[in-house]
Amino acid sequence: MGIEPNEHRLLRRLEGKLKVERMPYFLSILLVAMGQSVFAAEKIPSDTQNLKKGKAFTLAVLPDTQFYCDTRLKLSKKWGNGDLRRYFFEQTRWVRDNQKRLNIAFLVHEGDIVQADAPEEWAIAKEAMSILDGKVPYCMCLGNHDMGFEKADNKYGGNIGVNRTTHFNTYFPREKFAKRQEFGGTYPPDRHDNSWYHFEAAGMKFLIISLECKPRDEVLAWANKVVAKNSEHRVIVLTHAYMNKGKSRNTGGMSAKGNTGEQTWQKFVKKHKNIFMVLCGHHAGEAVRTDAGDHGNLVHQVLSDYQHLNNGGESWLRYMVFEPNENKIKVYTYNPVLNKFRNLPSSRFDLSYPMKRAE
């Protein structure tokens, strides 16, 4: 199928239905009026000597992929998207193929992996993610679409996130990931719903802790222990529904009982001086906010989700280049199908973060 790689399609999508992303829309109009494109076709940036020498590294981020796996629901038929799995495959292939070039140390998936916790959807996700096996280590978090699906006669074909049941553990079993050197542990001990992983890059130790959508109190208690016990690691928190595009942490929503984004911040994130970032999806759009934790450490909270764009996201992803010598994390939003970057202020930005200089 042909793809229209220009800003006009994005503006049409943003207009009307996507009022939730007003500021990027107006910025887009301004950019076009000034003769600038919303997109930028350019060489992969930050392809520097620091990356080649291991003095800098990259974290890859996959936002919601639910539409890429949706082959059966009424919503997909309504939008006329058809089978979109190729976009998921293009994402993971691109990450695999650019692992050495960008020194990609790890990949995270922000949840809503599938649309309605259906086996046929999980089979697509498994095939897409397996492209990374043995090449790029990764972890995933559960979104509301990944659990608790109940059939119903509505436009979505059912209700999602009503409980904690999920097929995730069948297709991404704990025992598979427990064999990997980056594996740290899970909660509950016999399931993969919540997990933590660790890796070293550019002379620093990092820990990624993945929390279920609306993590329960017992999950946050476990997470507090993991982070406290690994105080020498720099920690990134991965959870699905945490913050909206208005930069407010979630205070409600969804049927499953558990902690909101604000409660997760209060009960867990802000308590630890080694937590410096939270990554989330769920809400269509982009947003960043930075707050000080209880120990004065700055915590960057970053939302990215492109399911509202054409073809359920059309393979837009993020990657973050950690540059210790500059004490910066450089964030890029890239489309491997179009070979283009989004150059909106909310899409391409730098985050300050003190790191050990990699000599």
Regions found by a protein language model. Name each.
Residues A41-E120, E359:
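N-terminal active-site segment of His-dependent metallophosphoesterases
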Residues D47, K77-K78, A118-A221, K271, ...:
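Extended active-site neighborhood of metal-dependent phosphoesterases/phosphodiesterases
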Residues K53, R318-E359:
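A short C-terminal boundary segment appended to hydrolase-like catalytic domains
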Residues K55-T58, R101-F106, D133-C139, A201-L207, ...:
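Loop/turn elements at helix/coil->beta-strand transitions in domains of secreted/extracellular proteins
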Residues V61-P63, F106-D112, P137-G143, L211, ...:
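Active-site neighborhood of phospho(di)ester-bond hydrolases with catalytic His/Asp-centered motifs
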Residues Y68-D70, Q115-D117, L142-K151, H192-S195, ...:
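Active-site environment of divalent metal-dependent phosphoester hydrolases
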Residues G80, E218-A221, A228-F276:
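Active-site-proximal segments of metal-dependent phosphoesterases and phosphodiesterases across multiple
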Residues A256-N325:
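Conserved beta-sheet core of the metallophosphoesterase superfamily
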